[in-house]
Amino acid sequence: MLLASGAGSNVENIIKYFVSKPTVQVTSVFCNNPTAKVIDRAIENHVPVVVFTKEELKSDVVLDKVTALEPDLIVLAGFLLQLPASLIEAFPSKIINIHPALLPKYGGKGMYGQFVHQAVLDNNEKETGITVHFVNEHYDEGEVIFQKSIAVDDCTTAEEIATKVHVLEHEFFPKVIEQILTI
């Protein structure tokens, strides 16, 4: 199952990657934003969607729905809310996130999307990348599963950096998910 808050390009990429893989099934997409494009992308790809509020996430409503699905893995792909401890504790080592930087750099609260890419640019970094990590109770501090770097010293805008990072995300995130689920 996938959790997302926004456009959902990673979600769609993951769904399409696993269509022809009988060992892995994307069972649902949970979204906290009722106007997010990810909802349309999931529906277009015949994946059920559950929309919930921040209050439902904080209470046991989302936990109960997730538990009922018995997921082997919960994948955060552009999900912008912090998960409650009750959800993390119910699924130890079964929740992963992708972050658009090489953690521990540019992680933590408020560091997502363009904010990360702008910080990379502002600090004249020569490289950035992606990190896939387990989720714990602190933003972007879970155990690192996978990292991949890319040179960005030729980039002059945060948008150029974002484009390069998205290529990495789309290439490697589904493969990392597959490795975790088929070990």
State the predicted function of each range.
Residues 1-183:
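One-carbon transfer enzymes
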